[in-house]
């Protein structure tokens, strides 16, 4: 049984300040669209963020692929755009080391992710210490609420994130109700009977393409939302192959929102 409560209903009862804030943004903008913007220059990145900003609740970054990255030149303008357009930031870092190491990776180094990214994510392969390490780092460098997504399922062909691995990743998520806000997953992860309300964010969503030749497999917006996804993650479908980001941004925003309204019996 998938989640049928509305975003405002879930926000009211949710233990995570970050999740409450995200639900509020989603409701106010009528958007459950996350734009995945993987480009190589700060200029192109910021231009796409500014163009897509009105249509999204979340922007997903791989900040380490930007060749001319700097905190001052890349992150500070990104934060201003997040304020201008009212969206949150999700750095898709996919942490996968022991707690002490990820603590340093998250808070320090060249990227200082915990100082600017509202949400990040992690694999469960090293056990529950990864959650503790990331939570400690967040509390030490930021006064703003932070949230963690666990990688329970992936959209790529041949992914090993399934079965017992997925189950044990869910068990890791249960160790921290405040910091772990949900999953990167292809399906609903349950937990409501135990008092958990996890946000499900789903990559590999496309209105047109079925794959990319490199293992990515696309599913339709209506399919993933009906299956329990709360936020659809779209990348090249928004700005690749000569597409108009404004047109595609509104197209995906509308499709995602209508699928949510249908799942929650609002239409």
Curated annotation (Swiss-Prot):
Keywords: Decarboxylase, Lyase, Pyrimidine biosynthesis. The keyword Metal-binding does not apply. Pfam families: OMPdecase (PF00215). One of its GO terms (molecular function) is orotidine-5'-phosphate decarboxylase activity. It is an enzyme of class 4 (lyase). It comes from the Eukaryota. PROSITE patterns: OMPDECASE (PS00156). The active site is at 94 (proton donor). Belongs to the OMP decarboxylase family. This is Orotidine 5'-phosphate decarboxylase. The lineage of its organism: Eukaryota, Fungi, Dikarya, Ascomycota, Saccharomycotina. The gene is URA3.
């Amino acid at each position: 049984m998938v989640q049928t409560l509305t975003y405002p209903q879930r926000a009211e009862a949710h233990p995570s300040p970050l999740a409450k804030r995200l639900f509020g943004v989603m409701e106010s903008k009528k958007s459950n669209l996350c734009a995945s913007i993987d480009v190589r220059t700060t200029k192109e990145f910021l231009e796409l963020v500014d163009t897509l900003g009105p249509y999204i609740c979340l922007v997903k970054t791989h900040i380490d692929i930007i060749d001319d990255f700097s905190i001052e030149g890349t992150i500070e303008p990104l934060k201003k755009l997040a304020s201008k357009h009212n969206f949150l930031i999700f750095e898709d870092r996919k942490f996968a080391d022991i707690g002490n190491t990820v603590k340093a990776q998250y808070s320090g180094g060249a990227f200082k992710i915990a100082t600017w990214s509202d949400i990040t994510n992690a694999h469960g392969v090293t056990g529950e210490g990864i959650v503790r390490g990331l939570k400690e780092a967040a509390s030490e460098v930021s006064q703003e609420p932070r949230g963690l997504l666990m990688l329970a399922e992936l959209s790529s062909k041949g992914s090993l994130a399934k079965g017992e691995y997925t189950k044990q990743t869910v068990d890791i998520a249960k160790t921290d109700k405040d910091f772990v806000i949900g999953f990167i997953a292809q399906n609903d992860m349950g937990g409501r009977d135990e008092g958990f309300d996890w946000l499900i964010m789903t990559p590999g969503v496309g209105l047109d393409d079925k794959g990319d030749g490199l293992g990515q497999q696309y599913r339709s917006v209506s399919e993933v939302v009906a299956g329990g996804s709360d936020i659809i993650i779209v990348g090249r479908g928004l700005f690749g192959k000569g597409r108009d980001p404004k047109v595609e941004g509104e197209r995906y925003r509308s499709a995602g929102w209508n699928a949510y309204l249908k799942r929650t019996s609002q239409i």
